[in-house]
């Protein structure tokens, strides 16, 4: 019998359980995001890959829990819940936007503390964490609610009806602000001699999104870094044709990682 522990149920959504999968793909959603969209990717992968989608406090079944205060507590919680699973079989991380920074912070912690590393890191819509371009994003949480709504509309990806309903809108703004507050507490200074990771990194970006400093991801790994631009804006990954490209590409990377 394949049972999720209570901590696991709380922190991870796994819509398509595959206990015999060869690999696990751990997905980290965007700021203000829940687990459902990336958890559904499970159906697009073959039986060799099981998909987990990470859930932070303050949303979905964790709506009554206080939001995370900082990146350290986010990383510690995710690590403690997932550690056993990550030691069990090869795993990769996929993060979009805010989720990219969390996935990188978790990867750093796993490497430093446990000598564990993803076989591949998939980054989407995000500057490298030591890039100058990343700094303005860290200041976003202080802005007015209306500015956040305007920013959300420009980015797209948020259903219009969410922004129409007063309660849903308030909740979305609050969650976004809290997620951005977590981002403020994260800093990664790249030491000249110490390249923290050795896995390959693939960076994806929407061709019409604000350009991200993807080249700088070369500075955090001794592995290869590849860059792909897919049609669309910041939420290009929600387009069905792009979802198919992403899941096929991720599958190839995971299946060849062991060769």
Per-range role (PLM):
Residues 1-5:
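Hydrophobic alpha-helical signal peptides and transmembrane signal-/tail-anchor segments
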Residues 6-94, 101-259:
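Domain-scale detector for complete catalytic domains at protein termini or as standalone homologs
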């Amino acid at each position: 019998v394949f049972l999720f522990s209570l901590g696991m149920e709380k922190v991870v959504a796994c819509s398509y359980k595959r206990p015999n999968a060869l690999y696990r793909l751990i997905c980290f959603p965007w700021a203000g995001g829940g687990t459902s969209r990336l958890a559904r990717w499970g159906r697009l992968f073959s039986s060799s890959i099981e998909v987990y989608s990470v859930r932070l406090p303050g949303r979905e079944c964790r709506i009554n829990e206080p939001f995370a205060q900082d990146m350290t507590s986010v990383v510690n919680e995710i690590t403690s819940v997932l550690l056993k699973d990550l030691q069990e079989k090869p795993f990769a991380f996929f993060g979009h936007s805010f989720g990219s920074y969390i996935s990188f912070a978790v990867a750093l912690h796993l490497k430093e503390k446990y000598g564990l590393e993803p076989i591949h890191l998939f980054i989407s819509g995000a500057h490298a964490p030591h890039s100058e371009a990343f700094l303005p994003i860290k200041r976003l949480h202080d802005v007015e609610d209306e500015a956040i709504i305007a920013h959300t509309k420009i980015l797209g990806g948020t259903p219009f009806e969410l922004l129409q309903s007063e309660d849903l809108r308030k909740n979305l703004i609050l969650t976004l602000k809290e997620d951005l507050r977590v981002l403020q507490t994260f800093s990664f200074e790249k030491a000249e001699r110490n390249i923290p990771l050795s896995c390959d990194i693939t960076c994806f970006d929407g061709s019409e999104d604000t350009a991200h400093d993807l080249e700088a991801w070369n500075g955090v790994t001794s592995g290869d870094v590849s860059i792909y631009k897919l049609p669309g804006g910041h939420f290009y990954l929600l387009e069905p044709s792009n979802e198919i490209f992403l899941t096929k590409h991720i599958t190839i990377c995971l299946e060849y990682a062991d060769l």
